Amino acid sequence: MHHSIRNIAIIAHVDHGKTTLLDKLLQQSGTFEEHEEKTERIMDSNDLEKERGITILSKNTSIKWNNYKINIVDTPGHADFGGEVERVMSMVDSVLLVVDALDGPMPQTRFVTKKAFKYGLNPIVVINKIDRIHSRPDWVVDQVFDLFVNLNASDEQLDFPIIYTSAVLGTSGTDYLNMQNNMIPLYESIIKYAPAPNVNSDQKFQMQISQLDYNSYLGVIGVGRVKQGSIKTNDKVTIIDRFGKHRSGKVNKVLNYFGLKRMEINQGYAGDIIAITGLNKLKISDTICHPDNLQPLPALSIDEPTVNMFFSVNTSPFSGKEGKYITSRQILERLKKETMHNVALQIKETKDPNIFSVSGRGELHLSILIENMRREGFELEVSRPKIIFREINGIQKEPFENVTLDIEEKNQGSVMQFIGIRKGELKNMIPDSKGRVRLEYILSSRALIGFRSEFMSITSGTGLCYSSFSHYDNLQNSNIGQRKNGVLISNSTGMAVGFSLFNLQERGKLFIGHGAQVYEGQIIGLHNRSNDLTVNCLTGKKLTNMRASGTDEAIVLTTAIHFTLEEAIGFINDDELVEVTPHSIRIRKFYLKENERKRANRNKKSI
């Protein structure tokens, strides 16, 4: 049975086209029925994934081709979702490494490939987007080889097969000058080079939970590869957690993947990726085994969190006006539910019952969680992200990252100056002779907080920025990444008036427009100078019954700056919070009243 199964993961850098490639594999294998709707990026099922064009959660599918069953797992390309990538590697026997035919290997390519090599997996290299203008497949293959050598690949891993594809056009081939109008060369390579699962069908059942899903009808669904034996509906099993604790359970349903559907089956066999229901309180890494075979599988290792934020109950004067879930109990329940499947996330309660410490793999990892909660109807406040330092040999160290910037040559000077302020160390500079240049830096993770939004404004949206963890090193200057300018703070609650805002424009850039509801302590603009300024934005023009001798000056307001969630989180300083509700993102001071802020500053200086 297991000789006709192939388990592979698709890994790639963000936006190198692996989800689109998977679309074509699904469509051309005949997995879809005639009546089924065929949309783009089928596997990105989450709204945020479709909007941002990135994969956040790893997902399973399977295709049938020439009497073979190919189980495919689509993985995130971003290092912030490394916890997802790590778990997937334990389920598969080979990887499809998708690399852009123009860009070549990028920081995330290195990150996901390193994970695959850690598990001893041999890659099949797919050079995608071969139809791109100026594509350079030969150069890309050389770059991939160099990357593998740098990652200490074995001789077997260095002898990798290469397939050239254009996922958009649905073409593939072993020679980019002689492409076929279908994906058959890629199917053949998967069958030929991906090994069949190394499992034992005769021994008693054993599998490890690598993913969790939830369904209101079926309850908790555990997903993993059957390591040995087989499992049927209503079988009694023993669950062993990562700490070795045992408990008994009964399997309610055994499910299998076919295309985008989960289908109920009578029996799951060794080597196959299946889902089981009926076992509550499952956790990632749990071993499910036959009661007579109590042997736990090694626990899955997950990267430690690097960023910490505080989530708290919304305490602003506008609290409860927009959200459905606003209490600390509801927020804590939602965070605990998230940790069930989001294993790289850590939640700790603090001395204050309304504040929770949340740690994750990066700014993006946590902002995706906040955005999901916001869309579900939660109101909360979040602090500025703080990098988690690590003590090594009694010395405090902070994480550093490899940062790759792809920019237009005309922006090179301003970008290098911008990174110089953040103490970046230039490692490499590669012009492409077509008006763009690639800069490679080592930069502290602290300097990357709020980096991307400022970088995008410097490059007018044309720059590309990628980063992945490099190493831990000595602490740098404590003020790295802090905002240089002060802010404009509202001194009262009410409706902002155009007349006041017009007069405030010369003081800085505004975040609100005429008619916006504001409250005391809310940040309404960026000050031109380094100090904070408390201002009145509610006063209208004084009217008298005397006829004016001249004409009124026309009030023209410049367009207000509106922050996305990531931009707001990157903008704030340590004494500020982002208020997140289903319809609004506001920035406020931690202390809303001016006298409280002054007292806090005095206390800070006296320490």
Curated annotation (Swiss-Prot):
Residues 3-198 form the tr-type G domain. Transmembrane segments: none annotated. It comes from Buchnera aphidicola subsp. Acyrthosiphon pisum (strain APS) (Acyrthosiphon pisum symbiotic bacterium). GO terms for biological process: ribosomal large subunit assembly. One of its GO terms (molecular function) is GTPase activity. Keywords: Cytoplasm, GTP-binding, Hydrolase, Nucleotide-binding, Ribosome biogenesis, RNA-binding, rRNA-binding, tRNA-binding. It is an enzyme of class 3 (hydrolase). The gene is bipA. This is Large ribosomal subunit assembly factor BipA. Its EC number is 3.6.5.-. It is found in: Cytoplasm. Monomer. GTP binds at D15, H16, G17, K18, T19, T20, N128, K129, I130, D131. One of its GO terms (cellular component) is ribonucleoprotein complex. It catalyses: GTP + H2O = GDP + phosphate + H(+). Belongs to the TRAFAC class translation factor GTPase superfamily. Classic translation factor GTPase family. BipA subfamily. Pfam families: BipA_C, EFG_C, GTP_EFTU, GTP_EFTU_D2. A 50S ribosomal subunit assembly protein with GTPase activity, required for 50S subunit assembly at low temperatures, may also play a role in translation. Binds GTP and analogs. Binds the 70S ribosome between the 30S and 50S subunits, in a similar position as ribosome-bound EF-G; it contacts a number of ribosomal proteins, both rRNAs and the A-site tRNA. The lineage of its organism: Bacteria, Pseudomonadati, Pseudomonadota, Gammaproteobacteria, Enterobacterales.
